[in-house]
């Protein structure tokens, strides 16, 4: 039985994993993402435990997130290590992360500040990363439209929660932040997984590997700016500044939700990629040129960074869907680069800024953070260029057309009793290929190719290639008309 995708109207048929999307499942990613944003930009640790503890906690949190990503990536091929970790229920991971988050808000002094705080931050960061990877590993097997809508709606929900926590009394806000990982893990544990065909191409070519390297450089560039901006935010513990800071990501997330719901995945890909770097550039310019709109400029910078971050998740979901690489490998690799670059950006501003800033440390830190933002725009613009993004989008479009045709051919093959080799020949014929092309592609003799072609025509009840093409498209149209919408309950 097929189904019609709620956004594209295309039919998805298959036997592997399918997310039967229910709206409240977006809140799983939203809760975990909200935890990260509140810990980096909420300022609650500073208002409760003091400025010094907040500065240290952010650095240790980023280190813990990076450690979780490194561990996940390193253990992807080690079954003895990865197996026990993957068998741990998400709720247990979320409960441990929430417990460690409570310790972060407890005012600490002396030796405890350098023993208890690092342990709590690193463990909570690792728990966050394990939950994010587990959740996005599940969602990466959904179609691009569904994965994009889930991540963007989760981001919007996260920003709303972050603003809510800022306006709350510090103790109440800390309590909310402490339970976010647990809530996210409970929702993740309840996410329903069905069956769907995982659409995959072969291993990436050398050109695709170069593109993957450029994507990782792009991830490192905006993540470095994210870390530097979080260090800048730690200088001001006032709720007003943090609300203004989160307003940009909130507006950006709402915009991306609208685009993913309104446009096809290739169009949404292109528009989201076009948003990130220009918005960061405008934010840097306003912050440097107009002192009175400093908070607004920082808000735009963070909004652009969030757009780049969401684009990174969409690209990862696309890579997982189109290659044979495991989801945990692709996602952990990007998260590892993201966390390490963010930690480097944070350390650059938080450590070098006061050391080199002399009498005017705050102004120097601000300038250094803006320089990091400008560098991210330069790297993002000249390493992962608009040409690379367009090539990725065009390959997505070609893959989607090929996948849809392959679905129809697979259904016809099952109905008409074609052999696997005959199905391959029929798919090439439905694409309009001739006999020499089929011989070269499948590495078969001329007589063998002609025999398979005759068998395909005979079993499907057509007399030539044009009739087969028409028959395939008619079958595809019927599949779409007969598709069943997924349940929303």
Residue ranges and their predicted role:
Residues 128-151:
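Cytoplasmic helix-loop-helix junction between adjacent transmembrane helices
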Residues 144-169, 333-348:
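Glycine-rich segments within core transmembrane alpha-helices of 12-TM secondary carriers
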Residues 398-453, 458-459, 470-489:
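Helix-turn-helix DNA-binding segment
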Residues 92-110, 277-292:
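C-terminal ends and interior cores of transmembrane alpha-helices
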Residues 19-27, 54, 80-92, 143-152, ...:
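Membrane-interfacial loop-to-transmembrane alpha-helix junctions, especially the N-terminal start
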Residues 54-78, 251-256:
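Central cavity-lining transmembrane alpha-helices of secondary-active solute carriers
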Residues 4, 33-43, 66-67, 181, ...:
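Linker/hinge segments immediately adjacent to helix-turn-helix/homeobox DNA-binding domains
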Residues 112-131, 295-309:
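Hydrophobic core of transmembrane alpha-helices in multi-pass small-molecule transporters
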């Amino acid at each position: 039985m097929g189904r019609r995708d709620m956004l594209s109207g295309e039919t998805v048929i298959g036997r592997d994993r399918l997310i039967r999307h229910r709206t409240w499942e977006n809140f799983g990613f939203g809760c975990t993402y909200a935890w990260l944003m509140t810990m980096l930009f909420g300022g609650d640790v500073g208002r409760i435990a003091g400025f010094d503890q907040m500065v240290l906690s952010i650095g240790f949190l980023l280190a813990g997130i990076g450690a979780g990503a490194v561990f996940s990536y390193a253990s992807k091929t080690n079954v003895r290590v990865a197996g026990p970790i993957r068998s741990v229920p998400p709720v247990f991971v979320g409960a441990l992360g929430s417990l460690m988050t409570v310790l972060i808000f407890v005012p600490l002094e002396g030796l405890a500040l350098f023993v208890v705080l690092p342990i709590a931050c690193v463990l909570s960061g690792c728990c966050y990363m394990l939950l994010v990877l587990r959740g996005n590993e599940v969602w990466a097997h959904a179609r691009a439209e569904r994965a994009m809508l889930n991540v963007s709606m989760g981001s919007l929900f996260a920003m709303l929660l972050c603003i809510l926590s800022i306006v709350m009394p510090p103790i109440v806000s800390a309590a909310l932040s402490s339970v976010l990982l647990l809530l996210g893990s409970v929702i993740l544990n309840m996410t329903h997984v069905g069956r769907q065909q995982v659409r995959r191409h072969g291993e990436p070519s050398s050109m695709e590997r170069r593109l993957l390297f450029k994507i990782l450089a792009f991830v490192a560039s905006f993540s470095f700016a994210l870390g530097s901006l979080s260090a800048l935010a730690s200088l001001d513990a006032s709720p007003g500044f943090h609300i203004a800071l989160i307003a940009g990501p909130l507006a950006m997330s709402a915009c991306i939700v609208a685009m993913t719901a309104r446009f096809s995945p290739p169009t949404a890909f292109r528009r989201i990629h076009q948003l990130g770097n220009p918005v960061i550039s405008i934010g840097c310019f306003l912050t440097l040129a107009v002192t009175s709109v400093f908070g607004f400029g920082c808000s735009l910078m963070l909004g652009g960074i969030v757009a780049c971050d969401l684009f990174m998740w969409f690209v990862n979901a696309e890579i997982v869907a189109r290659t044979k690489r495991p989801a945990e490998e692709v996602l952990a690799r990007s998260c590892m680069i993201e966390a390490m670059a963010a930690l480097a950006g944070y350390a650059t501003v938080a450590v070098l800024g006061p050391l080199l800033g002399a009498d005017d440390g705050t102004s120097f830190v601000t300038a250094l953070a803006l320089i990091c933002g400008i560098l991210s725009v330069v790297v993002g613009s000249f390493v992962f260029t608009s040409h690379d993004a367009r090539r990725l989008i065009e390959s997505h479009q070609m893959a989607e057309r090929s996948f849809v045709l392959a679905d129809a051919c697979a259904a016809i093959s099952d109905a008409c009793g074609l052999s696997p080799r005959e199905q391959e020949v029929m798919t090439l014929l439905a694409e309009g290929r001739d006999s020499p092309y089929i011989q070269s592609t499948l590495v078969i003799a001329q007589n063998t190719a002609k025999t398979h072609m005759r068998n395909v025509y005979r079993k499907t009840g057509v007399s030539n290639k044009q009739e087969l093409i028409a028959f395939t498209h008619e079958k595809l149209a019927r599949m779409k008309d007969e598709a069943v919408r997924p349940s929303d309950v």
